[in-house]
């Protein structure tokens, strides 16, 4: 590509923001033209993030000063409630937008307002947003002006689950259970007691049992694939004592004698970022650390009709910034691996 794509990042001081900067620094087709932060305006990116010294000469600007309307695409790595106020103006000016918050993920406005506790500022734009689960919605993403980047838990659960629900029949009346674990970075960079080392280290706990915001997002994704499947879906997240990583264990009660391992292998045979492991393997979170990968395995429980699906991602990469870059590549007709060919870190 002769002319580079001009990229803006709104809210670039959080973990997903710095991941976007890290990944885009290695992208051959883009120029990061603007990074914004109201609290750090005037601070050099390299001073705020020493990991980026020698990579970026930019300084943070306020959104009003950054000239975002001159960009080809803008990423919103902001808390919930920001993109829905600021994205409509950019879209009207022809700028394409990828929102990494939850503002445009849930199509039913009352449901979104119930779970996120605020009035939606751009309800008319929600119906235009494309849900950016890249492997499952590629054609729509390619045409999108606005992409709602999925949450980390929905990505980890939906990538294995959707192909299986499309082709395998579950036993009626049996619950569909997703038991998930996340690293502490999933809570974001803003300080809170629960993410302190003395609280999260050497500890393991469930949370959000009465209801997690990613529950309606997953239910929306699987609704209609089988009768009553969304209503019977149970999701329990846990906080694990690690910085990065996400692990989902999904239990399927099958009734039709199909082979779910074959289904997954066939569906993701040519996938660039979804890896179906050999039979009997179990994926580890460290096997995807820093990479835009989802590794999946599936095994039948002993003396049971239950199949156990295991899925791992890096919550900050495939679960956030990496999938956002993948969606950008699809939107602009670029090679999907551009900026995303990093090998996982070990140890």
Curated annotation (Swiss-Prot):
InterPro entries found in the cross-reference section: AGPR_AS, AGPR_type-1, NAD(P)-bd_dom_sf, NAGSA_dehydrogenase, Semialdehyde_DH_NAD-bd
Family of the protein in this entry: Belongs to the NAGSA dehydrogenase family. Type 1 subfamily.
Which PANTHER family does the entry mention? Answer: N-ACETYL-GAMMA-GLUTAMYL-PHOSPHATE REDUCTASE, CHLOROPLASTIC-RELATED, N-ACETYL-GAMMA-GLUTAMYL-PHOSPHATE REDUCTASE, CHLOROPLASTIC-RELATED-RELATED
Annotated active site: 152
Q: Which residues form a coiled coil?
A: none
Query: Where does the protein principally reside?
Result: cytoplasm
Keyword Cytoplasm in record: yes
Q: Where's it found, cell-wise?
A: Cytoplasm
Gene Ontology cellular-component annotations? cytoplasm
Keyword Amino-acid biosynthesis recorded: yes
Q: Which cysteines are joined by disulfide bonds?
A: none
Keywords in UniProt for this one? Amino-acid biosynthesis, Arginine biosynthesis, Cytoplasm, NADP, Oxidoreductase
What's its catalytic activity?
A: N-acetyl-L-glutamate 5-semialdehyde + phosphate + NADP(+) = N-acetyl-L-glutamyl 5-phosphate + NADPH + H(+)
Please name the gene that encodes this protein: argC
Function, as annotated, reads:
Catalyzes the NADPH-dependent reduction of N-acetyl-5-glutamyl phosphate to yield N-acetyl-L-glutamate 5-semialdehyde.
Return the EC number. Answer: 1.2.1.38
Q: Pfam families from the xrefs?
A: Semialdhyde_dh (PF01118), Semialdhyde_dhC_1 (PF22698)
Which protein, by its recorded name, is this? N-acetyl-gamma-glutamyl-phosphate reductase
């Amino acid at each position: 590509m002769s002319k580079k794509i001009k990229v803006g990042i709104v809210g670039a001081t959080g973990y997903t923001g710095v991941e976007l900067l890290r990944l885009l620094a290695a992208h051959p087709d883009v120029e990061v033209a603007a990074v914004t932060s109201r609290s750090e305006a005037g601070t050099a990116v390299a001073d705020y993030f020493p990991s980026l010294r020698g990579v970026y000469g930019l300084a943070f600007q306020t959104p009003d000063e950054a000239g975002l309307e001159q960009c080809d695409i803008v990423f919103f790595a902001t808390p919930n409630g920001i993109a829905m106020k600021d994205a409509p103006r950019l879209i009207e000016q022809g700028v394409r937008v990828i929102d990494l918050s939850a503002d445009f993920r849930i199509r039913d406005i009352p449901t979104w307002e119930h779970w996120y506790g605020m009035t939606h500022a751009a309800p008319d734009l929600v119906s235009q947003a494309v849900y950016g689960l890249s492997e499952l919605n590629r054609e729509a993403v390619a045409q999108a002006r606005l992409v709602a980047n999925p949450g980390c838990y929905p990505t980890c659960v939906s990538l294995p689950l959707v192909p299986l629900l499309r082709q395998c029949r579950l036993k009626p009346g049996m619950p569909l259970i997703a038991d998930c674990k996340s690293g502490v970075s999933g809570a974001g960079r803003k300080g809170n007691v629960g993410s302190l080392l003395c609280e999260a280290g050497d500890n393991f706990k469930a949370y959000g049992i009465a209801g997690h915001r990613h529950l309606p997002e997953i239910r929306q994704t699987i609704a209609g694939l089988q009768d009553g499947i969304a209503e019977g879906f149970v999701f329990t997240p846990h906080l694990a004592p690690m910085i990065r990583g996400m692990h989902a264990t999904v239990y399927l009660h099958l009734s039709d004698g199909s082979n779910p391992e074959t289904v997954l292998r066939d569906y993701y045979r040519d996938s660039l970022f979804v890896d179906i492991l050999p039979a009997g393997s179990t994926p580890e979170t460290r096997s995807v650390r820093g990479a835009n990968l989802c590794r999946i395995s599936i095994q039948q429980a002993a003396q049971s009709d239950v199949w156990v699906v295991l899925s791992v991602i890096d919550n900050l990469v495939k679960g956030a910034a990496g999938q956002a870059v993948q969606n950008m590549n699809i939107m602009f007709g670029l090679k999907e691996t551009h900026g995303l060919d990093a090998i996982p870190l070990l140890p």
